[in-house]
């Protein structure tokens, strides 16, 4: 017997926003009466960029920037229509990308 589940992936640059959004999703789903696994922290992706400080001279003088992408995974086991309505009605911050798969 296979169990139906919904997988929610959260992605963002600010770790606090990602954690707040994951807590809000877990609370909404538990309030609707479904079983939740997570939030599971996935590896943080770090993109590093090195650029010249000056456009003309001083080749040895460089500046480094990094961009961190934080990810969380939440599994909702045996969701109902009420759980889906709770997920769709949830207001999350603009800095978090939410991907829902079945």
From Swiss-Prot:
Entries under SUPFAM superfamilies matching the protein: Ribosomal protein S10
PROSITE patterns: RIBOSOMAL_S10
UniProt key word Ribonucleoprotein: yes
Any one GO molecular-function label of the UniProt entry: tRNA binding
Top-level taxon of the source organism: Bacteria
Record keywords: Ribonucleoprotein, Ribosomal protein
GO biological process, one term: translation
GO CC entries: ribonucleoprotein complex; ribosome
HAMAP family reported for this sequence: Ribosomal_uS10
Record function comment: Involved in the binding of tRNA to the ribosomes.
Assembly and oligomerization: Part of the 30S ribosomal subunit.
Family affiliation: Belongs to the universal ribosomal protein uS10 family.
Protein name: Small ribosomal subunit protein uS10
Organism whose genome encodes this protein: Treponema denticola (strain ATCC 35405 / DSM 14222 / CIP 103919 / JCM 8153 / KCTC 15104)
This protein's encoding gene: rpsJ
């Amino acid at each position: 017997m296979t169990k139906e589940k919904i997988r929610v992936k959260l992605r963002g640059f600010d770790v606090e926003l990602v954690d707040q959004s994951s807590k809000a999703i877990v609370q909404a789903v538990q309030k609707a009466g479904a079983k939740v696994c997570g939030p599971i922290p996935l590896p943080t992706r770090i993109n590093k960029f090195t650029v010249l400080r000056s456009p003309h001279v001083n080749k040895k003088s460089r500046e480094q920037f990094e961009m961190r992408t934080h990810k969380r995974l939440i599994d909702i086991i045996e969701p109902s229509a009420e759980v889906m309505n709770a997920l769709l009605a949830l207001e999350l911050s603009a800095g978090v990308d939410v991907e829902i798969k079945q």
